[in-house]
Amino acid sequence: MTSKLEQLKQFTTVVADTGDLDAITRLKPVDATTNPSLLLKAAAIPGYADLLKQVKADAKGNVDLACDKFAVAVGSGILKVIPGRISTEVDARLSFDEPALLNKARQLIALYEAAGVAKERVLIKLASTWEGIRAAEQLEKEGIQTNLTLLFSFAQAQACADAGVFLISPFVGRIYDWYKKSTGQEYVGAEDPGVQSVTRIYNYYKANGYNTVVMGASFRNIGQIEQLAGCDRLTISPELLQQLSDDQGELPQVLKPGNAGEAKQHLNESQFRWAMNEDAMGTEKLAEGIRQFARDQEKLEKLIAEKA
């Protein structure tokens, strides 16, 4: 019997959710994703110490630019050991400023191209705010493909599909966390609200012919991953990838394109904002996620600023 990880790879593109080059080399994912929190974690790895000093020197004291250069350097290194693409995130503090998001995204792509990386191997990650979705729509028209992250609500998924974004990252574990805290209940298997959210989005996209890729993210256990086997892509931490690699049990495909989904519905800005207002979980987790990424971005800036 092959491992659950190898079985999963038969019907889902497996993505590593980490900036740890050693883990990526060992676990052999197709793609990789990073975010400000993962970059902060990577910055603590001794092997990156010289790189932090180098990007600070190259940026000539511009800490914001140094952070971008660090993200691109980490991403470029990862691309040397994976066949697919890297997702690099725009500063979360820009999440409600469409022009600033566009400028930052274009700057990241320019830095990648200066490092010899074609834009076709990069996905720009943006928070799934209304402004982030609109920025993504414009970037896609420019040939810059996007990954819409911090996606917790069905309304966000609907708006992303309408905008024609390349990929969305609906979060499973953080939805689970919210409901567990809110109700005091444990959720297992198909009863997990995070699993139900991604399943609903996947079925909606496939039923209505959307090309946007669904990449489930933010997992707390391999049970959640097993329930989403068959999803277009799943981005998984090295720890859970290792658990899947060590498990020789059977892993059947759960999500399939032929499953029934809801009828297509287009949302304008006011409808989107109202739907978000009515979704307490989605609103709280989006705001919390942006705050957390913003804090970690500030910590990374401080870390780089303090480097000799």
Swiss-Prot record:
It is an enzyme of class 2 (transferase). GO terms for biological process: carbohydrate metabolic process; pentose-phosphate shunt. Keywords: Cytoplasm, Pentose shunt, Schiff base, Transferase. Its main location: cytoplasm. Homodimer. InterPro entries: Aldolase_TIM (IPR013785), TAL/FSA (IPR001585), Transaldolase_1 (IPR004730), Transaldolase_AS (IPR018225). Transaldolase is important for the balance of metabolites in the pentose-phosphate pathway. The keyword Cytoplasm applies. It is found in: Cytoplasm. GO terms for cellular component: cytosol. The keyword Cytoplasm applies. Coiled coil: none annotated. The gene is tal. SUPFAM superfamilies: Aldolase. Belongs to the transaldolase family. Type 1 subfamily. Pathway: Carbohydrate degradation; pentose phosphate pathway; D-glyceraldehyde 3-phosphate and beta-D-fructose 6-phosphate from D-ribose 5-phosphate and D-xylulose 5-phosphate (non-oxidative stage): step 2/3. One of its GO terms (molecular function) is transaldolase activity. Its EC number is 2.2.1.2. This is Transaldolase. The active site is at K125. It comes from the Bacteria.
